[in-house]
Structure formats: C-alpha cells, structure tokens
Regions:
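Short S/T/G/P-rich N-terminal loop/turn motif that feeds into the first structured element of a domain
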Residues: 1-69, 76-96
Length: 96
C-alpha cells in the first residue's frame, strides 16, 4: 500500500501564500518525480495543504531533500508548518 505525506502550511501573508502556490504548481512535478500523486489545496487566503502519495516509505524519504529545500527557502514566510505521514487506506478517483 502507498504512503502519504500531508503538510499544512500557514503563511504570514496572502501574498506569501500566493507566491508559494504559483511556484508549487509550476515546479512540484519536476521536483518530486517519484510522487504517484500530488495535490495542493488552498484552504484559506494564507493556508495550504499539500498531499503527496508515494509507492512506499523509501520513495517518500528520497523526496525529503527536495522537500527540505523547498520549505527551507520559504521558511521566513511560514507562520506555522505541520506534517503528518501515514499509510494510504483508500485512494479512489472517479472519471465523473
């Protein structure tokens, strides 16, 4: 079964969040090539939840350097950051 990393970031300003969202949309696919699925959800003007699915823990760990680089570059813009990981129990996608 695959694993997920769920990261919630609260930014200091709407503009900081806007910049990060635009950058993630433009670059995440190339930065995290082993990710089976990448989702980003804007939950408020200053908050984002990113969900990354990987085949296994090893693949997720190999992505850690790119994740650390991305988050480190914008750390001064974060009000708070929370990360959780776990085994995916359901991954349903509908073509509707």
């Amino acid at each position: 079964m695959s694993v997920a990393r769920i990261t919630t970031v609260n930014f200091n300003t709407k503009e900081d969040c806007d910049t990060m969202v635009e950058n993630y949309v433009a670059n995440a696919v190339s930065e995290f090539p082993e990710a089976k699925q990448l989702l980003q959800v804007r939950t408020s003007d200053t908050s984002v939840v990113a969900i990354s699915l990987y085949a296994d823990n090893e693949a997720m760990e190999r992505a850690s350097a790119a994740r650390d680089k991305r988050l480190g570059a914008s750390h001064h813009q974060h009000e708070s950051l929370d990360t959780k990981t776990g085994e995916v129990k359901l991954n349903h996608s509908s073509n509707n």
